[in-house]
């Protein structure tokens, strides 16, 4: 294994160091593919950061810069299923603007979106992860400062690097991206759609480079590592594929060995067993009046067609025991009658005595008659036989003395001999009825089945089977069956059954949808946030939501459903809540739901106080105090961000013009600016609620609601705010958790800790933790396979835990 890893690393290093150029086939020039120019509405070609490419001013909000379906698909073809690419742009964004640089989305799913918020001074990357969940990475940085910046964000599997002006600003481990964009996905530049996310400023060299460390095309002097994270993930994936091949090969070998062992213990040649006899493949034999052949282990028989043999003088056609057709046999002529070899004739002599003759060698020869036994019947019941001198009683059982009746033929006693007759439902294959075959009454029209029935032939008879939807009256008749009345239908409990000729129809009741066999309740407006429609227009809401469509979040904090510890504040979240430590407290690492794990921060010991040098910091529960040593005259000044602020001084934060701070006897107190909407000079950026202009209103993402400037709302696990006509959204803050396995419940936004790794949808993957599968093959974390001996049981290794589940859809397709 170490040797293989070494080989891969050498290959990757050689590839990484082969050169600093960019293969044009791996470079997507967005402006060139969009064919932006002077004729493009809403943009204007202007002077850029350099003169080597075109630069465009994005300012007019009436624009619609969206790729055509053909252009988008051409770009997606290069991006699809790629885990290593870099977004590059040189830009100059207007101050306070919050706008989208590039957006790839389908319906509500953002597969890749880059935006810069001048309201919150941060850059956001939205993407869809391999777990098919929407993810957002937030990077605090002032990009909207009306200055030129060279920006790049490189993604290599789970590794992300952000460069600004050729300086590495952020480097993070993130969830792996999922770029399997479906058909119909939209690609926008400078906006999210026709309503939201308008970028204002100049952009130049907007590109996507599908290669490792694509940032070097913008900053050639940057160092390149060897190998990249995606290379390593690719190596791990190859090893997992080899493991899977090894497991499948081992399983095949095991099955082959088992089959060989079974073959060693059995007779493998195909054969047919008929009436206790074994016949080899293609062997033929006679079975009465049928000629049979063993074909693929099955006896196939056909009735013989007998021809009359042409016999020599002294011979005549006759049946031979064990043979179906007549063969030439010796005969004798006596008194004008023909006798076959072995047949006897009793003749009365002139003296009245019985003389017995037998045909032997073409001559009737006299033979000794056996001694006659006394009869146990009256003389009136005595019968004289032509074939013997001894009389028998009337009703004598000739069949018990032997007969030649074979298949489907039975022996019947007559007065002076035994004969063969066919069983009921069979016909004779020859005139002596020793062999018979079944009569197919159905095909020959000799049945009595009436309408609504189907005739089925059986050995010696037939049966009448009712057609589907009919009920049997007697052996030959069926009548229409009302499945609805007898409750023998297949309709859902929420469907109406309608009887039809030969069957029935199921129709879902009003308020339900389906095929009648399965009907589900229908809610006109749907059930949101994970709700379930349980009856027409009635939703069962999950915990934390209410309303006809489960559209309203229950504020557990204001409703008084929870009681947080005195050291914590209750923070409402969609479908949930958490108790957040108050200022002056921090969590001790136990992360209790009620906030009991909040403990005091010793600002004095940690240096997080604002006391000046002439005062002494004194820690308090949830805060601190600056005290003047006895006998000294202290200034009461404060230390804030490394600078001295005088006692009583008021100032505005450098990075937040909407927050005002003051120094009060060594303590720095900061608060949001008080908004006086009656003041004509009020700062509308800090006080958007004071902006009465219609142009400052915002349209909700659904297009159904309008918000005033300053309004806030939650949409798709993001906190949104309307600011002077622009909608800015950022991820909801989630409480910190410290656990190996977590899950985001349906309709909620924040993860919760769980103990069962198989239920987790968020796992801190550690490839050093492995699983041993059912065939003793070692599996890496993240690998998945079909369990040996099954077709629909999918197993996955999750941080050393093997988790298996059955795929119901797979079972249905079997």
Swiss-Prot record:
It is found in: Secreted. Disulfide bonds join 399-411, 405-420, 422-436, 442-455, 449-464, 466-478, 484-497, 491-506, 508-519, 523-533, 527-539, 541-550, 557-570, 564-579, 581-598, 604-617, 611-626, 628-634. InterPro entries: ConA-like_dom_sf, EGF-like_Ca-bd_dom, EGF-like_dom, EGF-type_Asp/Asn_hydroxyl_site, EGF_Ca-bd_CS, EGF_dom, Growth_fac_rcpt_cys_sf, Laminin_G. One of its GO terms (biological process) is fertilization. Keywords: Calcium, Disulfide bond, EGF-like domain, Glycoprotein, Metal-binding, Repeat, Secreted, Signal. One of its GO terms (cellular component) is extracellular region. Residues 395-437, 438-479, 480-520, 521-551, 553-599, 600-635 form the EGF-like domain. Pfam families: EGF_3 (PF12947), EGF_CA (PF07645), Laminin_G_2 (PF02210), VWC (PF00093). Transmembrane segments: none annotated. It comes from the Eukaryota. Residues 270-329, 636-691, 696-754 form the VWFC domain. One of its GO terms (molecular function) is calcium ion binding. Residues 1-19 form the signal peptide. May regulate neuronal differentiation, polarization and axon guidance. This is Protein kinase C-binding protein NELL2. It comes from Xenopus tropicalis. The lineage of its organism: Eukaryota, Metazoa, Chordata, Craniata, Vertebrata.
């Amino acid at each position: 294994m170490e040797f293989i890893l070494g080989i891969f690393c050498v290959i990757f290093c050689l590839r990484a160091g082969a050169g600093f150029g960019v293969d044009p086939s791996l470079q997507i020039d967005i402006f060139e593919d969009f064919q932006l120019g002077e004729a493009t509405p809403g943009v204007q070609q202007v002077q850029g950061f350099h003169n080597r490419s075109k630069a465009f001013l994005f300012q007019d909000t009436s624009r619609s810069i969206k790729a055509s379906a053909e252009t988008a698909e051409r770009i997606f073809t290069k991006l699809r299923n790629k885990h290593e690419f870099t977004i590059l742009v040189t830009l100059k964004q207007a101050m306070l603007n919050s706008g989208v640089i590039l957006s790839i989305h389908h319906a509500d799913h953002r597969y890749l979106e880059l935006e810069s918020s001048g309201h919150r001074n941060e850059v956001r990357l939205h993407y869809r992860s391999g777990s098919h969940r929407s993810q957002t990475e937030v990077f605090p940085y002032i990009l909207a400062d009306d200055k030129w910046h060279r920006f790049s964000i490189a993604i290599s599997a789970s590794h992300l690097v952000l460069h600004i002006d050729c300086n590495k600003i952020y480097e993070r481990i993130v969830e792996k991206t999922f770029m399997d964009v479906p058909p119909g996905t939209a690609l926008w530049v400078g906006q999210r759609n026709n309503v939201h996310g308008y970028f204002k400023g100049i952009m130049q060299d907007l590109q996507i480079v599908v290669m490792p460390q694509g940032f070097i095309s913008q900053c050639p002097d940057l160092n390149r590592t060897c190998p990249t994270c995606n290379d390593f993930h690719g190596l791990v994936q190859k090893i997992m594929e080899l493991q899977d091949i090894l497991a499948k090969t081992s399983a095949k070998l095991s099955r082959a060995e088992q089959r060989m062992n079974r073959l060693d213990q059995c007779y493998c040649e195909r054969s047919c067993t008929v009436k206790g006899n074994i016949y080899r493949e293609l062997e033929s034999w006679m079975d009465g009046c049928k000629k049979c052949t063993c074909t693929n282990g099955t006896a196939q028989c056909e009735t013989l067609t007998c021809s009359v043999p042409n016999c020599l003088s002294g011979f005549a056609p006759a049946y031979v025991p064990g043979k179906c057709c007549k063969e030439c046999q010796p005969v004798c002529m006596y008194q004008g009658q023909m006798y076959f070899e072995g047949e006897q004739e009793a003749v009365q002599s002139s003296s009245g005595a019985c003389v017995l003759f037998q045909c032997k060698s073409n001559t009737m020869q006299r033979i000794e008659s056996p001694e006659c036994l006394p009869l146990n019947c009256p003389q009136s019941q005595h019968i004289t036989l032509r074939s013997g001198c001894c009389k028998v009683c009337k009703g004598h059982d000739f069949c018990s003395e032997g007969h030649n009746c074979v298949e489907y033929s039975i022996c019947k006693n007559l007065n002076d001999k035994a004969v063969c007759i066919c069983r009921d439902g069979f016909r004779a294959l020859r005139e002596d009825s020793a062999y018979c075959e079944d009569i197919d009454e159905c095909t020959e029209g000799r049945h009595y089945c009436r309408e609504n029935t189907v005739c089925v032939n059986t050995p010696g008879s037939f049966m009448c089977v009712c057609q589907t939807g009919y009920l049997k009256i007697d052996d030959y008749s069926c009548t229409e069956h009302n499945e609805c009345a007898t409750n023998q239908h297949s309709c859902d409990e929420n469907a109406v059954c309608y009887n039809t000729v030969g069957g029935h129809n199921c129709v879902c009741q009003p308020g339900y949808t389906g095929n009648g066999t399965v009907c589900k309740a229908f809610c006109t407006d749907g059930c949101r946030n994970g709700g379930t429609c349980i009856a027409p227009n009635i939703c069962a809401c999950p915990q934390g939501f209410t309303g006809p469509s489960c559209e309203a979040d229950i504020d557990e904090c204001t409703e008084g459903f929870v009681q947080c510890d005195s050291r914590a504040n209750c923070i409402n979240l969609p479908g949930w809540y958490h108790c957040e430590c108050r200022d002056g407290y921090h969590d001790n690492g136990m992360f209790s739901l009620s906030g009991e794990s909040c403990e005091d921060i010793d600002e004095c010991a940690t240096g997080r106080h604002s006391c000046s040098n002439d005062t002494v910091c004194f820690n308090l529960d949830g805060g601190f105090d600056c005290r003047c040593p006895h006998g000294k005259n202290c200034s009461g000044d404060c230390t804030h961000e490394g600078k001295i602020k005088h006692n009583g001084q008021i100032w505005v934060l450098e990075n937040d013009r909407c927050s005002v701070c003051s120094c009060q006897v060594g303590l720095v107190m900061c608060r949001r600016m008080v908004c006086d909407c009656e003041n004509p000079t009020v700062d509308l950026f800090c006080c958007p609620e004071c902006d009465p202009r219609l142009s400052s209103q915002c349209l909700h993402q659904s297009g159904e609601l309008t918000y005033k400037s300053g309004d806030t709302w939650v949409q798709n696990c993001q906190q949104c705010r309307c600011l002077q006509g622009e909608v800015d959204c950022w991820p909801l803050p989630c409480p910190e958790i410290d656990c190996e396995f977590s899950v985001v419940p349906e309709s909620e936004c924040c993860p919760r800790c769980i103990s069962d790794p198989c239920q987790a949808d968020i796992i801190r993957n550690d490839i050093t933790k492995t699983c041993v599968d059912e065939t003793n093959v070692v599996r890496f974390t993240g690998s998945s396979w079909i369990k040996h001996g099954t077709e629909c049981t999918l197993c996955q290794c999750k941080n050393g835990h093997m988790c298996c589940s059955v795929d119901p859809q797979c079972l249905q397709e079997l």
